[in-house]
Amino acid sequence: MSQRMQQGQPMIIMGEDAQRVKDRDAQEYNIRAARAVAEAVRSTLGPKGMDKMLVDSMGDVTITNDGVTILKEMDIDNPTAEMIVEVAETQEDEAGDGTTTAVAIAGELLKNAEDLLEQDIHPTAIIRGFNLASEKAREEIDDIAERVDPDDEELLKKVAETSMTGKSSELNKELLADLIVRAVRQVTVEANDGSHVVDLENVSIETQTGRSASESELLTGAVIDKDPVHDDMPVQFDEADVLLLNEPVEVEETDIDTNVSIESPDQLQKFLDQEEAQLKQKVDQIVDSGADVVFCQKGIDDLAQHYLAKQGILAVRRTKKSDIRFLKNITGAAVVSDLDSIEAAVLGRASVRRDEAGELFYVEGIGDDVHGVTLLLRGSTDHVVDELERGVQDALDVVASTVADGRVLAGGGAIEVELASRLRNYADSVSGREQLAVEAYADALELVPRVLAENAGLDSIDTLVDLRAAHEDGQVRAGLNVFTGEVEDAFDAGVVETAHAKEQAVASASEAANLVLKIDDIIAAGDLSTGGDDDEEGGAPGGMGGMGGMGGMGGAM
């Protein structure tokens, strides 16, 4: 054995099915996977971005240009690609919008990093340079950002409209922006330190098909898209005691399989009487609690429905968990999971009315501390209202972030071009090879205005030249108007973005790129993916598994 080792033969420590790729091959594999994800969504960026049609394994169709929705619905079968998807999810959770921007920048950072790697610049130097650039970019964002008053409704509407532009909600963006800003203002409170806190837990979004999006409205309280369980139940209460129930009002089933042998009609009647008595006891417990209205998350037996109707109690079954949670907020009720422990103290107070035409219940809490509101979105089809809801949810998150953060930026690629210019100036003060990484970072940021122009059918090079010239003249707000093709003041054009979303996009993209660059060795117990093959564009080098559902994806989507 020692003789073989002296002859330079390697020691085999992994199983025969294991695969390993090292150094440049590993970096090339990871960068290719990350860029494939970025390519998949970059055509959706901006007001002129295209939509994607996603068909899942069940045949359900989703049509959207929302970055995080696209990446979540895609069948991604690659560990590196999944890391980039996490960038979009983090951006969505932290800022509510800017997911496509974050992923696109991450992909461009890695593309530029690959060029540096080919120049024999060590990944550690690139990572240090990217960290310096990211930190400097966030400092400059804060310096460039303009402060916004939470009472400035017009500016907040522009933020909402910018978020919705290019989505299905764009056709009615003025109406929807007004509803969104009013909703956010109703759930905003001022903290002791003067900051503003927006509680989006008190904002619910409900959808209804069959009508136009222009008929969407903002309602105080909750909207429950359910019917009463019995036609004889009252549906109107000015002041009602509300019970939220997470227990079925049905005959209790045993935990084990049992068989009952019935030998006579009397035995059958006793059995039925026992079930009826059990249901009657549950109904009596509800009646004794003083509840006028019951929203039950589970089922209600037909006989129990009859008893509740006789007592003049309104009951709704199979209420969504999210609706129960929202009703808890606006009525002050506690959710009861065991009728045996019910007390009057767990009941909430609310007014309840029925919209027979829309088949909806409107529930409005009673009291000074009630702030819950519902955005009722309407559209012609399920596909329309689903995409409308995604657009409104993003805009809602962005407006809430703007109110809490208090800073806005010019959109249309203005902030990216300005940051790139300032980073290039900053690079002159950076020593070593990190300077090249800072410059590469600046180039990556300019991807945003380039893609905005490409997606609008404009010449990206001419557009970038015009933007750079405007910013060199000191026009910090100069951005691309994709509708006219002109470079103009983005604020005057109403293209306004929240600073927090842009900061988060820069931070998330940088961290993801650095995480990928830091990997120099991939060791897999078997194939890295279950699909794809090495001949695909997305295939891995060195015999590694392919990209699965990602192979060649950038061109297919």
Swiss-Prot record:
One MF term in the entry's GO annotations: ATP hydrolysis activity
Top-rank taxon, per record: Archaea
Induction data: By heat shock (at protein level).
Gly residues: bias regions: 539-557
Annotated region described as Disordered, given as residue ranges: 527-557
Key words of the record: ATP-binding, Chaperone, Nucleotide-binding, Stress response
Gene3D superfamilies assigned: GroEL, GroEL-like equatorial domain, TCP-1-like chaperonin intermediate domain
InterPro entries recorded: Chaperone_TCP-1 (IPR017998), Chaperonin_TCP-1_CS (IPR002194), Cpn60/GroEL/TCP-1 (IPR002423), GroEL-like_apical_dom_sf (IPR027409), GROEL-like_equatorial_sf (IPR027413), TCP-1-like_intermed_sf (IPR027410), TCP-1_chaperonin (IPR053374), thermosome_alpha (IPR054827)
PROSITE patterns assigned: TCP1_1, TCP1_2, TCP1_3
Membership in a protein family: Belongs to the TCP-1 chaperonin family.
Binding partners and assembly: The thermosome or CCT complex is a oligomeric complex of two octameric double-ring structures; the complex is probably a heterooligomer of CCT1, CCT2 and CCT3 with yet unknown stoichiometry.
Main function: Molecular chaperone that assists in the folding or refolding of nascent or denatured proteins along with ATP hydrolysis. ATPase activity is highest in thermosome assemblies containing CCT1:CCT2, followed by assemblies containing CCT1:CCT2:CCT3. Seems to contribute to thermosome ATPase activity. Not required for growth.
Extra facts: One of either CCT1 or CCT2 is required for growth.
Protein name: Thermosome subunit 2
Organism: Haloferax volcanii (strain ATCC 29605 / DSM 3757 / JCM 8879 / NBRC 14742 / NCIMB 2012 / VKM B-1768 / DS2)
